[in-house]
């Protein structure tokens, strides 16, 4: 993770067709009293990844954050950027501290990748702002 100071606003690219992703971004936006986060739905019909300098396939595979100066953070690093942008709370501070421990960080990276790869299969999808139930896991 880059240790440079944050450059706000952070553009948060999230999958609006993923119920869990949508719920989490809404929760983060509610806590963002200073307006540091700008949520961009990659499932919107007019979304164009290349307009932001991002790879279209990769941005659909994992969460991305782009800082105001163009730095790109993905996966767990993207979550850390969000947590840093929000008012400090004990739970976020604990998560960020634990993620400095290499084995825990590796585990978090693996867990995130598994979630990202299977999010629609596990949690269903949304269409026209209405979420559909998840398909049974077989």
Model-derived regions, located:
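Thiol-based oxidoreductase modules, predominantly thioredoxin-like and allied folds used
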Residues: 34-48
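Generic secondary-structure microfeatures
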Residues: 16, 25, 41-43, 67-69
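Short, low-complexity, intrinsically disordered N-terminal peptides in bacterial proteins
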Residues: 1-8, 132-138
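A structure-centric signal for secondary-structure junctions around beta-strands
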Residues: 7-9, 36, 59-60
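Short cysteine/histidine-rich zinc-coordinating motifs and their immediately flanking basic loops
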Residues: 30-34, 138
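Local sequence-structure signature of Cys/Sec-based thiol-disulfide redox active-site neighborhoods
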Residues: 2-31
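Thiol/selenol-based redox catalytic cores and closely related redox-interacting motifs
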Residues: 47-138
């Amino acid at each position: 993770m880059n240790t440079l100071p944050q450059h706000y606003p952070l553009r948060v690219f999230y999958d609006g067709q993923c119920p869990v992703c949508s719920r989490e971004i809404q929760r983060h936006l509610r806590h963002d009293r200073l307006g540091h986060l700008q949520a961009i739905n990659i499932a919107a019909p007019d979304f164009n990844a290349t307009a932001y300098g991002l790879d279209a396939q990769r941005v659909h595979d994992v969460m991305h954050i782009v800082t105001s100066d163009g730095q790109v953070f993905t996966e767990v690093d993207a979550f850390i950027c969000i947590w840093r942008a929000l008012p400090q709370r004990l739970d976020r501070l604990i998560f960020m501290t634990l993620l400095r421990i290499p084995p825990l960080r590796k585990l978090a990276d693996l867990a995130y990748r598994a979630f990202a790869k299977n999010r629609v299969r596990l949690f269903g999808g949304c269409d026209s702002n209405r979420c559909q139930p998840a398909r049974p896991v077989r």
